[in-house]
Amino acid sequence: MEKEGCRMLGLKKLRAERGLSQLKVAMDLSISREALSYYENGRRSPDLQMLLKLSGYFNVSIDYLITGREFRKA
């Protein structure tokens, strides 16, 4: 049985909003399209290095990548 990862709600949302294909993002980040799909759908969780790459690529926080929501300071 494959281990379940954390679903990256913001990642899929950002990619769709920007009109980017999984293949384009995967190629830009030097990963497989399948790996990106697994991250988006929670079949695999990215390590910290990949979270930082994704965060930099989309210019958003890691929190946003995971939740799809902006966090505001109180």
Task: Describe the role of every protein-language-model region.
Residues 1-5, 13, 17, 56, ...:
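Short, charged recognition helix plus adjacent turn
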Residues 7, 11, 61-62:
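Hydrophobic side chains within well-formed alpha-helices
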Residues 9-28, 53:
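Short basic helix-loop element that most often maps to the first helix and adjoining turn
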Residues 11, 25-26, 36-39, 65:
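Conserved hydrophobic/aromatic packing and binding residues within compact polymer-binding modules
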Residues 30, 49-64:
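DNA major-groove recognition helix of helix-turn-helix/homeodomain DNA-binding modules
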Residues 31-45:
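Recognition helix of helix-turn-helix/homeodomain-like DNA-binding domains
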Residues 43-53, 72-73:
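Short, basic-rich loop-to-helix N-cap that marks the start of a DNA-contacting helix
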